[in-house]
Every structure is written in C-alpha cells, then in structure tokens.
Amino acid sequence: MALRTDWNGVFPAMVTPFRENGSFDEASFKALIELYISEGVKGVVVTGSTGEWYSMSDAERATVWEVAVEASSGRITVIAGTSAVGTREALALTRTAKAVGVDGCMLLPPGGIFAARNEVVNYFHTLAGVGLPIMVYNNPPRTGVNMDADMVAEIAKSEEIVSFKDINRYLYAASEIIYRVCDKLAVFTGLEPYASSVLPRGAVGVVSTISNICAANMVSYYNAVISGDSATAYKTQKLIDQLYHFLPTLGAPAFVSVKAAMKLLGRPGGEIRLPHLPANEALIGKLREELRRLKMMTLN
C-alpha cells in the first residue's frame, strides 16, 4: 500500500461522551464531531485510550464506529481504536471496524503481558491480514513495550501498516524512527508539545488528547509549524505546553481532567465511566482557575 499522504494534520483522540447512567451519548458524540470539523481537524481517533475503550464492550465500540462514520460523512478520516490484549480479540474487533467502514484502525501492542519483540512484530503482521489500514501505536507506559526504529521498520514490511503514532519522550529515539520509516508510514506524535520538534523531521501530524479541550488552537499550532510562522507557533504552543504540564498536577487520570475541562468550556464531552470516578469539586476549582488564567473561559 502506498504512503497515506491523506493522513496528516490534527486528529483529536476523541473522548467518548457517556450519560450519567453510563450509556453512550450519541447526540453529544455527533455534536463533538461537528465541532471538531468546524475547528479544522483532518481526522479523529475514536475508542482509543482517551475514548475509554477499556470500559466498553465490543458491541459498544462498534456502535461508536458506526456513528462516527455516519456523522463524519467522509469529510474527515475516521480511525477506530481496536486494541485488545489477545490476538483473536483484536482480529475480531478489526474485522468489525473494517465492515463498519472506518478508514483505518489504531492498535497498541498486546497490553499487560510485556510481549517479546518477535511476538509484537508477529502480532501486527497478523492483524495486517484483515486488510484495514493500521496505525501502530507506541505507548510504553501502557504496554511495557517500547518500539525502536528496527522494530518499527520490521512491522512496516506489511503493506496494511500505513501509520505510526509515538509517545516516546526521548526525542533522539523518536527522530530515528521518523527518519527510518517516514517514506513508508505517516508518522504522528501523541505528545502535543513535541509537534514543533518532530514535524520538521518528517512527522505529518498529531493525535491529540488536548484537542478535546482546544482543537482550534491545536490546528493553528500545527499549521503555524508547517508553514514556518514562528510567531503564531510560539503563541499557540505556549498555551498547549501550559495545559499539557498542568493537567497531570491535578492528580486524576488525564481523561477525567479532560472531560471536566470540556464541561467547564461548554464542550459536549459527557460523563466519565467506571472504573474512573468523576472529578471532585477541588479538582474542578483548580481547573476553572487555570482555564481563566489561560483566558480560555470567562470569569462568570
């Protein structure tokens, strides 16, 4: 398969809106997709970690994919998170995603088992047999697997492997992967502040959790970096950096804080689902204060 030149830009790692009773809030999800499209994103990743896939049944994930395809109507790229612990489970999910009509899928290595190098390579080659374009996701803290350039190049030998998302905080290692495979794979960073460093090296986009809070700003940041507009890049990156470093200080899982921020900003992120617990008043108060300081919300 040829390099996916249409996979580029800002792809929000979408939250999945839930109602207070835990059910999927389809109306809010559709509203979010429309909001992101209006803010200039080029694609979305649904039912990834930010989308709380680990709390959803396979049927629920399939429903989210169907709604995403319907709501986007071909206007943006839709990537379905089809990660699972076992190969059989991931194969079944990826086949379902293909049948639904998504543009591609995003997959972590098998999680929680610290898979060996050859097992990870075989895992992705096996899943490539489904025939759906795959974005390989390197997230060492979640999987215990840190892919280096040699491993990614080996995985990329399968034609259906078309993209790579990396959250490696070691810039040299991230750069080595980009240099090695950017002629074959559309490389995305999952670390928003790193975009200004990896895009000039050959990466093509950002899969962004923070975009749930400020997609328009993230798009402006990406466009400024790509076009060489250093003044706008500085202004927009400053906001992103501050959000990126502030959210972990709240002491809650990122997705809890992101949904709380969305609610404060009037963005339809919905409720969090168990095992996560809703943001408490102390966290919400700190969030409100920071969003005001960053001039992202009014004082009322």
Curated annotation (Swiss-Prot):
Alphabetically ordered keywords of this record: Cytoplasm, Lyase, Plasmid, Schiff base
Enzyme Commission numbers on file: 4.-.-.-
Keyword Protein biosynthesis annotated: no
Keyword Lyase belongs to the record: yes
GO biological process, one term: small molecule metabolic process
GO terms under cellular component: cytoplasm
Lineage: Bacteria, Pseudomonadati, Pseudomonadota, Alphaproteobacteria, Hyphomicrobiales
InterPro entries: Aldolase_TIM, DapA-like, Schiff_base-form_aldolases_AS
Cellular localisation: Cytoplasm
Protein name: Uncharacterized DapA-like lyase
Function comment: Upon expression in E.coli complements a dapA deletion mutation, but this may not be its physiological function.
Induction pattern: Expressed in vegetatively growing cells and in nodules.
Assigned protein family: Belongs to the DapA family.
SMART domains cross-referenced by the UniProt entry: DHDPS
MF terms in GO: 4-hydroxy-tetrahydrodipicolinate synthase activity
SUPFAM superfamilies, A to Z: Aldolase (SSF51569)
Active-site annotation: S49 (charge relay system), Y137 (proton donor), K165 (schiff-base intermediate with substrate)
Top-rank EC class of the record's enzyme: lyase
Complex and partners: Homotetramer.
Site (Involved in proton transfer during cleavage): Y137
